[in-house]
Amino acid sequence: MKTHTIGIIMNGVTGRMGTNQHLIRSVLAIRGQGGVRLANGDMILPDPILVGRNPDKVRALAEAHGVSRVAPSLEAALADPFNRIYFDAQTTDRRAAAVRQAIAAGKAIYCEKPTAADTATAAALYRECVAAGLKNGVVQDKLWLGGLRKLRALIDSGSFGRILSVRGEFGYWVFEGDKQPAQRPSWNYRKEDGGGIAIDMLCHWRYVIDNLFGKVAAISCLCATHVPERRDEQGRAYACTAEDAFYATMQTDQGLIVQFNSSWCTRVRRDDLLTLHVDGARGSAVAGLRDCWTQSAEDTPRAVWNPDIEQPIKFFDGWRKMPDDPSHDNAFKAQWELFLRHVVNDEPFPWTLLEGAKGVQLAEKGLESWRKRAWVEVGAIA
């Protein structure tokens, strides 16, 4: 048995998502389990090196989690041939320049979404990787969530019969930063800094819809900035220049209607922060982050409209919770393991930077639809 130790440059992981999901729950968790085992018994052991704009934060993060390697600069990390993978979790407006540095250094590229601030740049990054012969990928974590894996199994088994419609609801209340600290960074609400929920979340819904319900063909979208002023990390008031909610209707290439509401200004009264409600001729399902509930045509209650009496049907009681999958793992970690297998053992990895560009494209088309107050076609990326 051989161990393939592989250096991973992790840029911008001092933020909430980078620290928790990518460093702690993915790369360090993989190290903690001894690596990723290949079919021949060999192991892949990731060895992270941290880099970022704030050296003090980077060093503190490394010390807190036992990471021995910290780079003095991105250039120094890229110059070391031991580091074969470049991972980027910076803010969107900084991503393309750093990824291009990594491409020039011949590194495999793996990065968060949005992969760029616009479709042209996102597509160019993919083409540049291909031209350089470099393996590349984008984080599409929600495909490995427990609830969506169960939903995928229902679709594959034909449980729905003909799927009629899909409704997605995502969001929660993000505090304004005055009475309670905000749960999201202030740049999320400034368009000039790459913020906005459309560019953030439509990138996610593109790959979810494409992989479960058919390719997105058209979109009609309305955005809003419901909270006009918030307070930043220093407690200073600032004007919100980016949208904090969008309400989208999409059509797939199979003619399926998919509605998606996403908001940082909503109080949750549903099963989870994200729910996907799928209605089919033979049954329905509601999937959350971890769980999925189903109702067959035979178990569907006979609803009768009568507002003059208390509702006699307890609608939540008519749904069955699907059993958990014991093999389920953290969604980010699951995709990290696949990407490591791809880089070291050339195993398939279809979630390339082209898929990332498609997400950016849908966000741009959604914003275009909002400006035009019209349906906008979503075509192939040239």
Where do the model's predicted regions map?
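N-terminal Rossmann-like dinucleotide-binding module
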Residues: 1-65
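C-terminal capping/lid region of NAD(P)-dependent oxidoreductase domains
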Residues: 3, 134, 161-165, 368-382
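Short acidic low-complexity segments
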Residues: 69-81
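Beta-strand-loop-alpha-helix segment that lines the small-molecule cofactor/substrate pocket
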Residues: 84-85, 91, 96-143, 158
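Short, well-ordered coil/turn residues at beta-beta hairpins
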Residues: 88-89, 252, 261, 280
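Hydrophobic residues in well-ordered beta-strands that form the structural core
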Residues: 111, 136-138, 167, 260, ...
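Predominantly a Rossmann-like dinucleotide-binding segment in NAD(P)-dependent oxidoreductases
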Residues: 142-240, 373
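C-terminal glycine/acidic-rich active-site capping loop/insertion
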Residues: 231-233, 238-239, 247, 251-252, ...
